[in-house]
UniProtKB/Swiss-Prot annotation:
Coiled coil: none
Cellular component terms (Gene Ontology): cytosol
Compartment(s) where it occurs, according to its Swiss-Prot or TrEMBL record: Cytoplasm
Major place of residence: cytoplasm
Oligomeric form and interacting partners: Homodimer.
Protein name, per record: tRNA (guanine-N(1)-)-methyltransferase
GO terms (BP aspect): tRNA N1-guanine methylation
Binding site for S-adenosyl-L-methionine: 116, 136-141
EC category: transferase
């Protein structure tokens, strides 16, 4: 099985060493599960200053990335990707990326990620070439490189064989619409704080129910909006009600 191809168009390709040289994504690259290439629009300019931006029409602060270098870089990225590659622009104007979206992207054969800079890129490029716009949150960053790396990392975790333990991705936060439960490791007691007894019991069913209850409770406390879009089973409703009752009594 060929790995997922990710072609990135960025003015700062060296930043993506964080993906190719470290952690799970690095291992995926070495195993051939992820193929990562970067394309710098500066390499497609025709002037000695390698100009990739210009002032915005209508005035205003900042600069806007020019169309031509982006189009030429995109053409090479598409040729490298082969076949049909989904073109994604990382943008604060995009839809907010959710785990369900990541799962869909992990099924693609190839992705081309556009990492903008300055005030953004010429809208005509977006209209002509971009399939989807995605945002990683409601805050301002200096460019699209970090969001692109977030997307690559999230997608890579879902590629078969990328994680050391096959069940790790299924147990992550958001995978089933809930936040993750608390985790503990040795020592059993640290500065007077003990690991919950149920985790030491060896009773797998009790442990499963405790973890599910903690996930439900943590989601209710911190991200109640996630519960609004999730239909709880009878067991989940009972566990959450018990969690809330215990919290109110404490």
């Amino acid at each position: 099985m060929a790995g997922l191809r990710v072609e990135v168009i960025s003015l700062f390709p060296d930043m993506f060493a964080a993906i190719s040289e470290y952690g799970i994504t690095s291992r995926a690259v070495k195993q051939g599960l992820l193929q990562l290439n970067c394309w710098n629009p500066r390499s497609y300019t025709e002037d000695r200053h390698q100009t990739v931006d210009d002032r915005p029409f209508g005035g205003g602060p900042g600069m806007v990335m020019k169309i031509k270098p982006l189009e030429l870089a995109l053409a090479d990225a598409k040729r490298a990707a082969g076949g049909k590659a989904k073109v994604i622009y990382l943008s604060p104007q995009g839809r907010q990326l959710k785990q369900a979206d990541v799962r869909e992207l992990a099924n693609e054969e190839a992705l081309i990620l556009i990492a903008g800079r300055y005030e953004g890129i010429d809208e005509r490029f977006i209209e002509a070439h971009v399939d989807e716009e995605w945002s990683i949150g409601d805050y301002v960053l200096s460019g699209g490189e970090l969001p692109a790396m977030v997307l690559i990392d999230a997608v890579t975790r879902l590629l078969p064989g990328a994680l050391g333990h096959a069940g790790s991705a299924e147990e992550d936060s958001f995978t089933d619409g809930l936040l993750d439960c608390p985790h503990y490791t040795r020592p059993e007691v640290y500065e007077g704080k003990c690991v919950p007894e149920v985790l030491l019991s060896g009773n797998h069913e009790h442990i499963r129910r405790w973890r599910l209850q903690q996930s439900l409770g943590r989601t209710w406390e911190r991200r109640a909006d996630l519960l609004d879009s999730r239909s709880l089973s009878g067991e989940e409703q009972k566990l959450l009600a018990e969690y809330i009752r215990q919290r109110n009594d404490s």
